[in-house]
Design a protein with these regions (language model features):
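N-terminal signal peptide c-region/cleavage motif recognized by signal peptidases
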Residues: 17-19
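Low-complexity, acidic/polar, glycine-enriched regions of mature
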Residues: 21-217
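Bacterial N-terminal signal peptides that target proteins for export
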Residues: 1-9
């Protein structure tokens, strides 16, 4: 009798567990294992690749309902690295990123559409160089699951996008430097139910710090 009476309880627990798994889960972007790569034509000779670091970010992902997903990322523009101090200074300087005036780029998704088994399109708004414009990112879900030793649950994504730098007010050297910039994203994020809250706290703290610094001048 005891054996049979345990079946409804077990079934109920299984249903509860299934419902919990179906909900969107929040992840904190791993800034060490995530990168933003950018490339533009250099006078027709080559397309050098540079790297930008992600300062902070979080994402929400539901493998059963991609439409409920969301991504918010801040990119550290002063971190731009093309492997040469001169190039780095030029790219982060006033003629291009102007990182001293605009230290971060901000991307926030507004819609996520599944296009294939592991592929999708991310529509969002990118704020760069003081200009906010819509940007579309094509992405692939590489893997979602526990790490080798099971200490963390990680979600991994790769993405690509293209933008016209002149639309963001970066008009210098249009003949020597291509206006179309190709963006490649490699993202790893750790399961963290506090990811959104922690991001907001860090962003608010940074905003207050910048406001205080501006008031001192």
């Amino acid at each position: 009798m005891r054996r049979w009476s345990s079946i409804p309880l077990g079934l109920a627990l299984a249903l509860v567990a299934s419902a919990a798994i179906a909900h969107p889960l929040d992840y904190r972007v791993d800034t060490v294992h995530s990168q933003v790569l950018f490339s533009a034509d250099h006078d027709g000779y080559s397309k050098p690749v540079g790297r930008l670091a992600i300062a902070r970010g979080w994402l929400r992902f539901d493998p059963d309902d991609w439409g409920a997903s969301k991504v918010v990322v801040d990119i550290d523009l002063a971190s731009a690295d093309l492997g040469d101090k001169g190039w780095n200074a030029a790219v982060t300087g006033s003629k291009f990123l102007d990182a001293a005036k605009f230290p971060t780029a901000h991307f926030e998704s507004v819609a996520v559409t599944k296009t294939g088994k592991d592929t999708g399109t991310l529509d969002g708004k990118l704020t760069l160089h003081g200009v906010a414009l819509p940007v579309k990112v094509d992405f692939t879900v590489n893997r979602v699951g526990a790490t080798l030793f099971g200490f963390e649950t990680i979600a991994g994504f790769s993405g690509r996008a293209k933008l016209d730098r002149t639309q963001f007010g970066m008009n210098a050297f249009p003949k020597a430097i291509g206006t179309e910039v190709t963006i490649r994203l490699e993202i790893e994020a750790s399961l963290d139910r506090h990811a959104e809250y922690d991001y907001q706290q860090a962003a608010n703290k940074l905003m207050r710090s910048r406001a205080h610094a501006a008031a001192q001048h």
